[in-house]
Amino acid sequence: MAPSDDLVYMAKLAEQAERYDEMVEAMNSVAKLDEGLTKEERNLLSVGYKNLIGAKRAAMRIIGSIELKEETKGKESHVRQTAEYRRKVEAEMDKICCDVINIIDKYLIPHSSGAESSVFYYKMKGDYYRYLAEFKTGTEKIEVSELSLNAYETASKTAQTDLTPTDPIRLGLALNISVFYCEIMNSPDKACQLAKNAFDEAVAELPSLSEENYKDSTLIMQLLRDNLALWNSDMADDADDIRERTDTTGAKGDPAA
């Protein structure tokens, strides 16, 4: 039995028990064997980290909302306590993101074989820098945003040339890059453009979509379409607000009135 077999089994066991810290620990040990990861193994690693960071991101959203409410109430002691708690969760997020990025850079990218695994790892790297950008500020936010974009662009170059438009990894990459542009770069126009291009290209190739990828690919396509609808609606609302303000300002300032 290969050394990785016991570790992979433990990772699967930990996943079933929803003990994601132990799942990640087991899969990190597999990565450090320097043998590269199989498709199943890299998915296990991704699922473990996704659940770990997902819980922290959800906590951050809740804490951020509470912090705003306390600021509105003007309760300084509560604001201070909430801010301290937020910083605690930020530190935990920082560690998770830095750990996975280190594993990717040190063990996974150097041992990736083929376009699929390369795109997977660079996409994952972009994702975790994006999660850092969600709470970093100032120059730190700029730095991690640039690192996220660099990783996404590296993944995208390979995906465009070596993966089909309906490949779930390529579609997932397009989905996450578009989210990056909307939420981190505050560029919904660019986000919509990327999401629409990915969706349209995939639709054109649907007849050749393999049965193996059908479920995953169509699910991501639906997410792309949902995001497009949401972002276009938000931009339309913003445009209406701007027109209303312009009309009001114009009427007040028009010398011919």
Curated annotation (Swiss-Prot):
GO terms for biological process: protein localization; signal transduction. SUPFAM superfamilies: 14-3-3 protein. It comes from the Eukaryota. SMART domains: 14_3_3. InterPro entries: 14-3-3, 14-3-3_dom_sf, 14-3-3_domain. Belongs to the 14-3-3 family. Is associated with a DNA binding complex that binds to the G box, a well-characterized cis-acting DNA regulatory element found in plant genes. This is 14-3-3-like protein GF14-G. The lineage of its organism: Eukaryota, Viridiplantae, Streptophyta, Embryophyta, Tracheophyta.
